[in-house]
Amino acid sequence: MNISATILLAFGMSMDAFAASIGKGATLHKPKFSEALRTGLIFGAIETLTPLIGWSLGMLASQFILEWNHWIAFTLLVFLGGRMVIEGFRNTPDEDDAPQYRHGFWILVTTAIATSLDAMAVGVGLAFLQVNIIATALAIGCATLIMSTIGMMVGRFIGPLLGKRAEILGGIVLIGIGGQILWSHFAG
């Protein structure tokens, strides 16, 4: 996977966390940068670990399904991307409207884990491709740190406008990467 695909994957994977951070920022009363950075660090750390876990699981099975690798990566990315697009169009109840001043650590960890499960599945798919998983996981984690921090700071301003669209955009990026993987297999 080339560097542009890695960057697209990293920011595509960060969109769930970005959307969640917008929601978290929207519920806080004047979030401070330190709170946004704390959220970004938690989300980024977990989002770095989950593709590594998925990749490890995928490597255990790689000897059995190596000839299907492009189809597995394509299917996982299209499935996850499609799920993100569908979730982006769903109407979900808003979080509690009462302003808060800080989110609890375990609430953030739980949210980060929930938004990073797709990164674990992508890690499984990446096990069947020739990628530097450490660099890819770090790129995903850094993109998530950046996007989550930004999402928290601007959440209360753009939450009603962009919140779900961020998830839709992330899903479209994942579907595009899946298509690129399949195309590169058949083209070359």
Swiss-Prot record:
It is found in: Cell inner membrane. Keywords: Cell inner membrane, Cell membrane, Ion transport, Manganese, Membrane, Transmembrane, Transmembrane helix, Transport. It is a multi-pass membrane protein. The chain crosses the membrane at residues 3-23, 41-61, 62-82, 106-128, 143-163, 168-188. The keyword Transmembrane helix applies. InterPro entries: Mntp/YtaF, Put_MntP. GO terms for cellular component: plasma membrane. GO terms for molecular function: manganese ion transmembrane transporter activity. Belongs to the MntP (TC 9.B.29) family. HAMAP family: MntP_pump (MF_01521). Probably functions as a manganese efflux pump. This is Putative manganese efflux pump MntP. It comes from Enterobacter sp. (strain 638). The lineage of its organism: Bacteria, Pseudomonadati, Pseudomonadota, Gammaproteobacteria, Enterobacterales.
